[in-house]
Amino acid sequence: MEIDDCVIDMIQVFSKINREVPEKAKKAIVEIERLDILAKKEMEVAKKHKIEFFANYEEMTAEQKTKAFTFMQKKMAKVSEYSDQKIEIASGLKVLLKDVYGKFMEEEQKFIENLNKIPKAPETPPSSSPSVRSHRKKKLSEGDDDAPSSVDEKKRGRKKKPESEKAVAAAEPPKMYCWCQLDKNDTMIECENPGCKYGWFHFTCIGMITAPAGDWYCTNECRAQGLAAVAEAPQKAPQRKGLKKKK
């Protein structure tokens, strides 16, 4: 299995966890709370009859005593039944979480094993030749706008954004990149596929030490899409956005 396949499998496991586990856990908790309420009501009824039973014990006939005692037994049996149902639901949820955790650990192990098989790319000195793509690093400051694309906008000579657009952009939540969806201090590399869902990836998340000399794609699927886009519009070959230091 290739590294791309392992990554795709891990993403699918993450998606399944985010899609199924919270919903099933929520339903289980709601059902347990419902059973708690029912058990509490039965306990209150049993307690009330118990008090009345002992208060009127001397005046009650043998038949009344038997009926009262049988009634309290039924109520306590119902409470026990609700408790068993709660335990069963909690046990099922525990099994679900254990299975999901085991599946994730299995995919993680496959990813690590395949990652160790990848040969380390040798460091190459940056080239000033226009025919060779170079990877540029950029350290972002707190005042940068549209972090990943700001360098390209300057190189393509785009006009500075109006203040109104900057205000709107500042009000929007920052876009999260990489499979981890975390904002952390790490060097990032961009997938050459313009339609890539994540765009930028942390070196530590993909096991990269040095940037490759040529184009880089996060998965084979992105590679196919990116090359297809270049083939359809060869006059608009994508320009390398390079690397950046994420803080």
UniProtKB/Swiss-Prot annotation:
GO MF annotation, one: zinc ion binding
UniProt keyword annotation of Metal-binding present: yes
Record: residues binding Zn(2+) 2: C191, C196, C218, C222
Disulfide bonds: none
UniProt note on tissues of expression: Expressed widely, including in the two ASE neurons.
Keyword entries, A-Z: Metal-binding, Nucleus, Zinc, Zinc-finger
Disordered, as annotated region: 115-168
GO cellular component: NuA4 histone acetyltransferase complex; nucleus
Compartmental location: Nucleus
Superkingdom of source: Eukaryota
PHD-type zinc finger span: 175-224
Binding site for Zn(2+) 1: C178, C180, H202, C205
PANTHER family, per the entry: ING FAMILY MEMBER LSY-13, INHIBITOR OF GROWTH PROTEIN
Function of the molecule: Required to initiate and then maintain lateralized gene expression in the ASE sensory neurons. Involved in determining cell fate in the ASE neurons.
Protein name: ING family member lsy-13
Organism: Caenorhabditis elegans
Classification lineage: Eukaryota, Metazoa, Ecdysozoa, Nematoda, Chromadorea
